[in-house]
Protein backbone atom coordinates (compact mmCIF):
# COMPACT_ATOMS: atom_id res chain seq x y z
CA UNK A 1 0.00 0.00 0.00
CA UNK A 2 1.37 3.43 -0.94
CA UNK A 3 1.45 5.98 1.85
CA UNK A 4 3.02 8.96 0.12
CA UNK A 5 6.33 8.42 1.91
CA UNK A 6 9.59 7.51 0.23
CA UNK A 7 12.51 6.52 2.46
CA UNK A 8 14.98 6.88 -0.45
CA UNK A 9 14.36 10.55 -1.19
CA UNK A 10 14.23 12.19 2.23
CA UNK A 11 14.79 15.90 1.75
CA UNK A 12 14.65 16.83 5.44
CA UNK A 13 15.47 15.05 8.67
CA UNK A 14 13.91 14.71 12.11
CA UNK A 15 14.49 12.65 15.25
CA UNK A 16 12.15 9.80 14.34
CA UNK A 17 12.31 8.40 17.88
CA UNK A 18 11.30 11.68 19.56
CA UNK A 19 7.98 10.33 20.86
CA UNK A 20 9.39 6.94 21.91
CA UNK A 21 10.63 7.95 25.38
CA UNK A 22 8.93 10.06 28.02
CA UNK A 23 10.93 13.22 28.73
CA UNK A 24 9.84 16.67 29.88
CA UNK A 25 10.59 18.07 26.41
CA UNK A 26 8.71 15.32 24.56
CA UNK A 27 5.73 15.64 26.89
CA UNK A 28 5.62 19.43 26.40
CA UNK A 29 5.59 18.99 22.59
CA UNK A 30 2.91 16.29 22.91
CA UNK A 31 0.74 18.61 25.03
CA UNK A 32 1.22 21.49 22.63
CA UNK A 33 0.37 19.22 19.70
CA UNK A 34 -2.79 17.99 21.44
CA UNK A 35 -3.95 21.61 21.66
CA UNK A 36 -2.60 23.21 18.49
CA UNK A 37 -1.23 20.51 16.20
CA UNK A 38 -2.74 18.02 13.85
CA UNK A 39 -1.98 14.82 12.00
CA UNK A 40 -2.70 15.27 8.31
CA UNK A 41 -2.68 12.59 5.60
CA UNK A 42 1.13 12.49 5.34
CA UNK A 43 2.39 14.90 8.00
CA UNK A 44 2.33 16.10 11.58
CA UNK A 45 1.89 19.85 11.64
CA UNK A 46 1.27 23.07 13.45
CA UNK A 47 -0.17 26.34 12.07
CA UNK A 48 0.30 29.28 14.43
CA UNK A 49 -0.19 33.03 14.46
CA UNK A 50 2.78 35.29 13.72
CA UNK A 51 3.28 36.04 17.40
CA UNK A 52 3.78 32.33 18.18
CA UNK A 53 6.60 31.64 15.72
CA UNK A 54 9.01 31.21 18.66
CA UNK A 55 7.08 28.13 19.81
CA UNK A 56 7.51 26.54 16.38
CA UNK A 57 11.24 27.25 16.56
CA UNK A 58 11.38 25.50 19.96
CA UNK A 59 9.50 22.48 18.62
CA UNK A 60 11.71 22.31 15.55
CA UNK A 61 14.81 22.39 17.77
CA UNK A 62 13.40 19.82 20.20
CA UNK A 63 12.63 17.26 17.49
CA UNK A 64 15.90 18.00 15.66
CA UNK A 65 14.01 18.84 12.47
CA UNK A 66 15.53 20.37 9.35
CA UNK A 67 12.07 20.98 7.89
CA UNK A 68 11.40 24.67 7.09
CA UNK A 69 8.96 26.87 8.95
CA UNK A 70 6.88 28.55 6.26
CA UNK A 71 4.88 31.76 6.39
CA UNK A 72 1.47 31.59 4.80
CA UNK A 73 -1.56 33.87 5.09
CA UNK A 74 -0.47 35.63 8.30
CA UNK A 75 0.52 32.40 10.05
CA UNK A 76 3.58 30.22 10.44
CA UNK A 77 3.46 26.55 9.54
CA UNK A 78 5.69 23.61 10.38
CA UNK A 79 4.84 20.28 8.74
CA UNK A 80 6.86 17.12 9.38
CA UNK A 81 6.38 14.32 6.85
CA UNK A 82 7.80 11.31 8.63
CA UNK A 83 5.71 8.17 9.17
CA UNK A 84 7.88 6.88 12.03
CA UNK A 85 7.54 10.14 13.98
CA UNK A 86 3.79 10.26 13.33
CA UNK A 87 3.34 6.65 14.44
CA UNK A 88 5.22 7.47 17.66
CA UNK A 89 2.85 10.38 18.35
CA UNK A 90 -0.16 8.16 17.67
CA UNK A 91 1.18 5.53 20.11
CA UNK A 92 1.30 8.27 22.75
CA UNK A 93 -2.40 8.99 22.19
CA UNK A 94 -2.42 11.75 19.57
CA UNK A 95 -5.32 11.08 17.22
CA UNK A 96 -5.57 12.48 13.68
CA UNK A 97 -8.79 14.41 14.29
CA UNK A 98 -8.87 17.03 17.05
CA UNK A 99 -12.59 16.62 17.59
CA UNK A 100 -12.15 12.99 18.72
CA UNK A 101 -9.35 13.77 21.18
CA UNK A 102 -11.52 13.56 24.26
CA UNK A 103 -9.10 11.66 26.50
CA UNK A 104 -5.70 12.51 27.86
CA UNK A 105 -2.98 10.02 27.09
CA UNK A 106 -1.64 7.87 29.92
CA UNK A 107 1.18 10.21 31.01
CA UNK A 108 3.60 9.28 33.80
CA UNK A 109 2.88 11.49 36.82
CA UNK A 110 6.30 13.17 36.80
CA UNK A 111 5.66 14.49 33.25
CA UNK A 112 2.03 15.57 33.60
CA UNK A 113 2.91 19.21 34.35
CA UNK A 114 4.95 19.42 31.13
CA UNK A 115 1.96 18.17 29.13
CA UNK A 116 -0.28 20.79 30.74
CA UNK A 117 2.31 23.53 30.12
CA UNK A 118 2.49 22.56 26.44
CA UNK A 119 -1.27 22.31 26.16
CA UNK A 120 -1.76 25.79 27.61
CA UNK A 121 0.98 27.49 25.58
Where are these regions (language model features)?
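Intein-associated homing endonuclease modules of the LAGLIDADG/DOD-type, together
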Residues: 2-121
Amino acid sequence: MKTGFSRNKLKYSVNEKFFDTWTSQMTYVLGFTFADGNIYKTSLGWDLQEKDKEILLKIKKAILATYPIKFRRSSYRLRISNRILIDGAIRKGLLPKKNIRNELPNIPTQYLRHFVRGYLD
